[in-house]
């Protein structure tokens, strides 16, 4: 198989994306799910945004919270000079000094999903507004890295749903990329990089998934089965890294 890089790369950059709020800036547009719909190539993009901080001593954290039964973005502000116990060296997150990655306190960006369309798969126009925005209950820290699987006339979108409790995998479906139906978390934290097969095998849906053990073992690929795309089980190890890696 011959593979060539597109001479028009990158297809999308942060400069192509309009922030969802005036006080936000675009940090990245990446890790897109891709499919075809009505003669167009659809990219469902992860768009990462962060708060514009005018004070260099401040780190602003956007999160989604439930307020009066509505989902709203709230901003938490840390002053570096007042928080010597915290580590701000990695611009992607705030963590406790001397602790491992699992002690991340907050992410500095909030990701949503946005649609870009193309007639030729090269030149894309990205929507001005988010297609799907995170909710407080499942995605208070953002929704990331969508993957699209078409089964019959329905497009199933699995994506990483992030909260303070970890990164799991949730499911959304659509028939037209205008209306979306949420189905909730299908793999609990920490489990991500899910790939749903486009056809049943022996009458059941099948998916690769990647649980992340924190004690014994390493992140490796597992395979799971489901009768309805919601309830997954029959997990078994599929493959992993070699012993000399």
Residue ranges of model-derived segments:
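Beta-rich carbohydrate-recognition and catalytic domains
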Residues: 1-141, 149-195, 199-245
């Amino acid at each position: 198989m011959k593979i060539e890089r597109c001479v028009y790369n990158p297809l999308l950059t942060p400069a192509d994306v309009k922030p969802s709020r005036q006080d936000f800036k675009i940090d990245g547009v990446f890790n897109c799910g891709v499919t075809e719909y009505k003669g167009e190539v659809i990219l469902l993009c992860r768009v990462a945004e962060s708060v514009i901080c005018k004070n260099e001593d401040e780190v602003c954290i956007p999160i989604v919270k439930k307020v009066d039964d509505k989902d709203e973005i709230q901003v938490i502000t840390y002053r570096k000079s007042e928080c010597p116990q915290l580590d701000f060296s990695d611009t992607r997150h705030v963590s406790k000094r001397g602790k491992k990655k699992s002690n991340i306190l907050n992410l500095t960006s909030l990701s949503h999903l946005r649609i870009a369309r193309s007639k030729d798969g090269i030149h894309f126009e990205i929507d001005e507004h988010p297609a799907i925005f995170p909710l407080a209950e499942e995605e208070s820290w953002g929704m990331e890295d969508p993957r699209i699987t078409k089964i019959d006339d329905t497009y199933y979108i699995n994506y990483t749903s992030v909260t303070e409790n970890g990164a799991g995998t949730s499911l959304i479906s659509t028939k037209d990329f205008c209306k979306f139906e949420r189905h909730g978390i299908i793999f609990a934290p920490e489990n991500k990089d899910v790939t749903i097969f486009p056809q049943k095998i022996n009458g059941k849906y099948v998916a690769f998934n990647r649980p992340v053990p924190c004690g014994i073992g390493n992140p490796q690929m597992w395979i799971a089965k489901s009768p309805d795309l919601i309830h997954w089980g029959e997990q078994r190890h599929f493959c992993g890294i070699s012993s000399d890696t």
